[in-house]
Amino acid sequence: MISIQNVSHGIGGQTILDNVSLDIPQGGITALIGPNGAGKSTLLSFMARLQPLKHGKITCGGLDVTATPTAELAKTLSILTQENNIVSRISVRDLLMFGRYPYHQGRPSENDKAIVENALASFQLQTFAERYLTELSGGQRQRAMIAMVFCQQTDYVLLDEPLNNLDMYYARNLMQLLRRLTDEHSRTTVVVLHDINPVSYTHL
C-alpha cells in the first residue's frame, strides 16, 4: 500500500497540494484523474522522491520514501515522468536493459536479458529493438519508455500520463496490457490521467 499523509506543497504563494491524505491499496491499477494544474504529477513526484517532501509523509510498502536508501527504493518503486532525460542515441534494447540497472549494476545476467526480451515481446517492440530512440515515432518511444519501467520489476509502478503520444488504438491496447501485467505480477500501478475514458481499464 502507498500511504499519503497530510502532504502540502505550494509555489510562489500558490497552493498546489493542500493537506492531501489518501491510501492507495495494494495491487491493481489506481488512476489519479483531474485537469492540468491539479497537482497530480506533483504528488506522483513526491511518491518517487523526485523532489523533497517538506510537509507530510509518504510510505510505500511500509518504507518511508524520504528516508529509504536510494538503492532499496529503486528496487521498490519505478516511475515514468512526462519529461525524461534519457539519451536519445540509445537503442530500444539498451533502454530496456537500463531499467535493469539497479540489479545488474552494468553486468547483465541471462535473467536480465530474458526479462528484456519478454518486455520487447509484450510491448510489441521486437521490430524496433535495435533502433535508436531518435528513429522512433512518439508512440513507439512512449511504449519503449513504459517497457523500460516494467523491466525494473518493482512492486510499485508510477506512470505520469502514460498515454501521451499514443493514438486511440495503442492507448487502448496499452491500458489492457498494463492491467494484464499488473494482475499477473501482483503489482501496484498508479497512473496519472487527464482523460476519463481509459479509467475502465483501472481497478480504482
State where each predicted segment sits.
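Conserved ABC transporter NBD signature motif
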Residues: 56-64, 73
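The feature captures the beta-strand-to-loop junction immediately N-terminal to the Walker
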Residues: 33-35
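Catalytic Walker B motif of ABC-type/P-loop ATPase nucleotide-binding domains
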Residues: 157-161
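Conserved ABC ATPase signature
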Residues: 132-136, 140
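Helix-to-loop junction immediately C-terminal to a conserved catalytic motif
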Residues: 48
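Conserved small/polar residues in nucleotide/adenosyl-binding loops
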Residues: 202-203
